[in-house]
Amino acid sequence: MIQIKRALISVSDKSGLVEFAKFLNQNGVEIISTGGTLKLLKDNGIAAIAIDDYTGFPEILDGRVKTLHPKVHGGLLGVISNPAHKQKMEELKIPKIDLVVVNLYPFLKTVSKPEVQLEEAIENIDIGGPSMIRSAAKNYKHTLVLTDPNDYKKIQNLISSSGISEEISASYMRKAFSHTAMYDAAISSWFYKQSGEVFPDVLNLSFIKKQKLRYGENPHQAASFYEPLFTKSDFSPLQGKELSFNNMLDFDAAFHISSLLPENTVCIIKHLNPCGIAYADNPLEAFQLARRTDPISAFGGVIGIKGQVNGELATSITENFVEGVIAQKFTQEALEVFSKKPNIRLIEIQDFKEALDELDLRPIHHGLLIQDRDYTTITEKDLKVVTKKQPSPDDIRGLMFAWSCVRFIKSNAIVYTEENATLGIGAGQMSRVDSVQLGANKALNVGLSVVGSYVASDAFFPFRDGIDALAKAGAKAIIQPGGSVRDEEVIQAADEHGLIMVFTGMRHFRH
């Protein structure tokens, strides 16, 4: 058991400290402290020794050197059960320090400010704090280290009851090393980001557990959601069952798609694939257009809405089973409608804007693949008309909408659209012609005609069979990357059928 007789306290986050320090004082614990922490303690009538009085050495270099002293680290690292350590500490008059309460300069908070200057960031890099934390954590069998104000009450209760066992101290040791590792990762990441280097030679990733999820991809799998240090989610859950792993993935997909499309866009997601996308003058009309694409697949889906959900739209949504809705805003009337279906998960995210600097991380066996997210867009000027038949301005708008949709569909991907709504989606097939046929059949199965439709393909057509199938289905115009060794054959097929075809020069594979 660790007997706490002496504590060193030096914190940036002072929440809960006064009550905890008073408790230590009342239990006969001698307190050593520094700077602003010392002032807070003394202002509240808590006895404490200044660090320079304790070490006999003044703070120097504008406070950059306070606790980097053998009397401090000897007291933290000394193994009192080791006779040689004990003898040397007695010889050098180094008392044992049994408890360290330290949290670090607010580097993350500082660099999160939009106009932070390099000098300010540097001055908020803590040196002495991490050193004390690591020393105490290394010697956890004899020294307790606390880095989180939320733990003060637990330690008070333990000191008052069963005491501090080695097992308990070990749990705080693990937390302490995670704390300093996260701190160093934040500093490293920020400086790399300032340099413009996206893929550093050494990658440090730190994530904080945000919440435990209902379960993983399947009910027998456990799962949790973690947030990266520099990104705070503004997802606001308003109602509904606990989120599962799959729910989070589908909500994320719904957000990504809606955020990159025009105002009043609605998309419906099932297993990470959109089964309907549309935009209109208002979200209700867009929802009705998106749902008609594939009402069967929309059953149990997640809906993303770039706009406001009112009572009328909420009523329309609740006529069928859905897992959840993510939108910019829910009116009070909408919330009242949804409250009658309390299992529907509602998430509000007012800033429906994509973080364009995000990276795409994929774990693989023995490694991690990292790439830029596929956010690059094209304009009408990037289109190359390759057929004899030329597109009208309306055709260009329809093709651009189809192209904006196909990038979100699993490869091989084909999407049939009108100017502002999907008609049929062929997703995830191993051959492109199968996706062509699947998309047309999906539309026909729900009574939608693809005659005169705009068709987007996420990658080039390797053979003319896909073009022949599109012509047979009644498509009017095709947008695709181009780049196949058989492009001339494919263009010839389009000309034979009187189709419009444009090349983008950009592929949108999605695995």
UniProtKB/Swiss-Prot annotation:
Matching InterPro entries: AICAR_Tfase_dup_dom_sf (IPR024051), Cytidine_deaminase-like (IPR016193), MGS-like_dom (IPR011607), MGS-like_dom_sf (IPR036914), PurH-like (IPR002695)
Pfam families per the UniProt record, alphabetical: AICARFT_IMPCHas, MGS
GO CC terms in record: cytosol
Domain MGS-like residue range list: 1-147
Keywords on record: Hydrolase, Multifunctional enzyme, Purine biosynthesis, Transferase
UniProt-recorded Gene Ontology molecular function terms: IMP cyclohydrolase activity; phosphoribosylaminoimidazolecarboxamide formyltransferase activity
A biological-process GO annotation: 'de novo' IMP biosynthetic process
Reactions that this protein is recorded to catalyse: (6R)-10-formyltetrahydrofolate + 5-amino-1-(5-phospho-beta-D-ribosyl)imidazole-4-carboxamide = 5-formamido-1-(5-phospho-D-ribosyl)imidazole-4-carboxamide + (6S)-5,6,7,8-tetrahydrofolate; IMP + H2O = 5-formamido-1-(5-phospho-D-ribosyl)imidazole-4-carboxamide
E.C. no: 2.1.2.3, 3.5.4.10
PROSITE patterns according to UniProt: MGS
SUPFAM superfamilies hit by this protein: Cytidine deaminase-like (SSF53927), Methylglyoxal synthase-like (SSF52335)
Pathway terms, separated by semicolons: Purine metabolism; IMP biosynthesis via de novo pathway; 5-formamido-1-(5-phospho-D-ribosyl)imidazole-4-carboxamide from 5-amino-1-(5-phospho-D-ribosyl)imidazole-4-carboxamide (10-formyl THF route): step 1/1; Purine metabolism; IMP biosynthesis via de novo pathway; IMP from 5-formamido-1-(5-phospho-D-ribosyl)imidazole-4-carboxamide: step 1/1
SMART domains: AICARFT_IMPCHas, MGS
HAMAP family registered for this protein in UniProt: PurH
This protein's domain notes: The IMP cyclohydrolase activity resides in the N-terminal region.
UniProt family annotation: Belongs to the PurH family.
Protein name: Bifunctional purine biosynthesis protein PurH
Organism lineage: Bacteria, Pseudomonadati, Spirochaetota, Spirochaetia, Leptospirales
